[in-house]
Amino acid sequence: ILDSNQNISPQNLFIGQQIQIPGYVGLAYQIRRGESLWAIAQSRKISVEGILLANPNITPTSLQVGQTIKIPLRITWRVVTGKRNYDYNSLVIDIRRLQTVYPFLKISSIGNSVMGKELQEIVVGNGNKRVHFDGSFHANEWITTPIIMTFLDDYLLSLTNGNTIRGIQTTPLYEQTFLSIVPMVNPDGVDLVINGPPSDEPYRSNVIEWNKGSTNFSGWKANINGVDLNDQFPALWELERDRNPKSPGPRDYGGEAPLTQPEAIAMADLTRRRDFARVLPFHTQGQVI
């Protein structure tokens, strides 16, 4: 609750002040003829006190037909919808949903893709162990993004409902760990694989040319500039340059120099700034994550 209300002083709460309760949402409900708060609470399996807390300005004995109140609803199911073609827009929608239900999430932009899409970082927890997850460095491995988002969803459900994950209590993990997640490093590439070439030029003409005239991009790993982001880092970059393609294409071209692509620059800057103790990039090949 404290992490969901960082602008509020716990020692200086006042009557009527609104705070955010993680793991709950308020559903709008219209009063029907003959209904009482007790009857509504019974039908929804919640307490009258919970309804009153969500509606501090109502008078329980003077409810009006058609009056709208908020019904507090505890979230006990996944918010993320991962089993679909998970493009950038799907990610943005799911991040927004998670932030609504779990306001203790910290969402920020660490940079932009070539085509201007925000690269979003999600931070959970406030411990000293600095851990990082990321997915979709490679465009055709986009399934790693919904897997990470589903894992995050399960973690948040466990935290707010007091459940374990495979027998492990998660509250200590939250208290001990600073978890940073960039779920989609290569959004332009992911959208290319899932939705086909963009209408924007010169990107459309370039990617079709580099893909040998085909509009089937299911094997495309690179970003929209035809650069493999995983080969963009100044760590033995010259070895990758010498053994891989020398021009833009669907895979393995490391660029003209290290850190020329905005997505790689953003990830390198984030890693230096956060000083992670552990980094777990999610990849998939041969039906293995």
PLM features: residue spans?
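Primarily a LysM-type cell-wall glycan-binding module
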Residues: 17-47, 67-69, 73
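The alpha-helix within a helix-turn-helix
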Residues: 2, 41-42, 52
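Short glycine- and acidic-rich boundary segments immediately preceding or forming the N-terminal edge
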Residues: 50, 72-115
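Active-site/substrate-binding loop(s) of hydrolase catalytic cores
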Residues: 128, 142-146, 150-152, 156-289
